[in-house]
Amino acid sequence: MANRQRVLGIVLAGGQGRRLLPLTADRAKPAVPFGGIYRLIDFVLSNLANAGFLKIVVLTQYKNHSLDRHITTTWRMSTLLGNYVTPVPAQQRVGPRWFSGSADAIFQSLNLVYDEQPDYILVFGADHIYRMDPRQMLEEHIASGASVTVAAVRVPRKDAHAFGVIQPAASGPERGRRVARFLEKPADTEGLGLPDAPDEVFASMGNYCFTTAALLDAVIRDAADERSAHDMGGNIIPMFVERGDAAVYDFHTNQVPGSTPRDHAYWRDVGTLDAYYDAHQDLVSVHPIFNLYNQDWPIYTHHRPLPPAKIVHDGTSVVDSLLSDGVIVADARVSRSVLSPSVYVDRGAVIEGCVLLDNVHIGRGAVVRNAIIDKNVVVPDGAAIGVDPQRDAERFTVSEGGIVVIAKNAVVEP
């Protein structure tokens, strides 16, 4: 049923990602590399494309050059069939101003909706790690009769303070399906537990399915409200909740081809350095919590013409790690790490629990532990990173969890 409807995908990709600094100092948050060869935005675009939703606009704003370049070089659809993935920056169609919120981004881009005339609009975020078949959400939305359906992931009630929390109806024919309340990062979680799991709550995933007319009406009215922050989660969704016109979609029910009980319903918000690091650690075990190797629901990205990874010399050890194309590990030890394209690890180096982005060079005898190193950084021979917390804090960014982060193109002293 879902594929017979006219559906437009709108991906909100204008986020700055301040909590991911310095990784976002030179790029938009959705353009941050992940998992060796991907960008964060590849996950939402792959979910939409795998589901057959091939008319997608990506609303961009903050430091969008690398993001726009990635989309235009990677996500080229067949124009013969009218399909497209198009990055759309703020165009100042309603005056000399940029996007002032996610709802305002849609309001300023309504010409794209009018041109396509869809029956339904999928408004999805651009910076989460997950697999999802959005057709199933659309089908539930149509069956519910609601104007909007909000996708929700189950999280422990004790963690509710970190999320926008959806409280579903606790009784009546809409029990567990209609949204009774929407609370942003509630301090008091008493009574917010789910009807079938009192110790869990629904956290908003930032993914919404709208009936088109309802979304148009909402963003137009919101644009006229000078008191509004013009935010989808903070202003638009509460409009529908207040009048009982919002449904909730339980992400746990989503069935993705090729998924296993271990990675079923995996979803990660990688909005902090520690969360970004932890999500990489989810990739590297023998049976990973998130499996990049599921070819029944592939994650698409741009593949550069690089040679295969190479491991040389008898003394080399690589354990529980991902090696991308162009990587060379020469008589060194690598464990629990993700190495992006063209990383070079020289003789005698030790890499433990690290995320190394493109073109990082690790010198001879260097020791690097629990670190994220951005592109084009040269770690000199004999350097020690992640070994002396005090010296690390003097030279680099250190996350709350103790992860050392080195900015793109940084010069590392011996």
Swiss-Prot record:
It catalyses: alpha-D-glucose 1-phosphate + ATP + H(+) = ADP-alpha-D-glucose + diphosphate. Alpha-D-glucose 1-phosphate binds at residues 164, 184-185, 204. CDD domains: ADP_Glucose_PP (cd02508), LbH_G1P_AT_C (cd04651). Transmembrane segments: none annotated. It comes from the Bacteria. Its EC number is 2.7.7.27. The keyword ATP-binding applies. Keywords: ATP-binding, Carbohydrate metabolism, Glycogen biosynthesis, Glycogen metabolism, Nucleotide-binding, Nucleotidyltransferase, Transferase. GO terms for molecular function: ATP binding; glucose-1-phosphate adenylyltransferase activity. Pathway: Glycan biosynthesis; glycogen biosynthesis. InterPro entries: ADP-Glc_PPase, ADP_Glu_pyroP_CS, GlgC_bac, GlmU/GlgC-like_hexapep, NTP_transferase_dom, Nucleotide-diphossugar_trans, Trimer_LpxA-like_sf. It holds the Pfam family Hexapep_GlmU. The keyword Nucleotidyltransferase applies. Disulfide bonds: none annotated. One of its GO terms (biological process) is glycogen biosynthetic process. Involved in the biosynthesis of ADP-glucose, a building block required for the elongation reactions to produce glycogen. Catalyzes the reaction between ATP and alpha-D-glucose 1-phosphate (G1P) to produce pyrophosphate and ADP-Glc. Homotetramer. Belongs to the bacterial/plant glucose-1-phosphate adenylyltransferase family. This is Glucose-1-phosphate adenylyltransferase. It comes from Acidothermus cellulolyticus (strain ATCC 43068 / DSM 8971 / 11B). The gene is glgC.
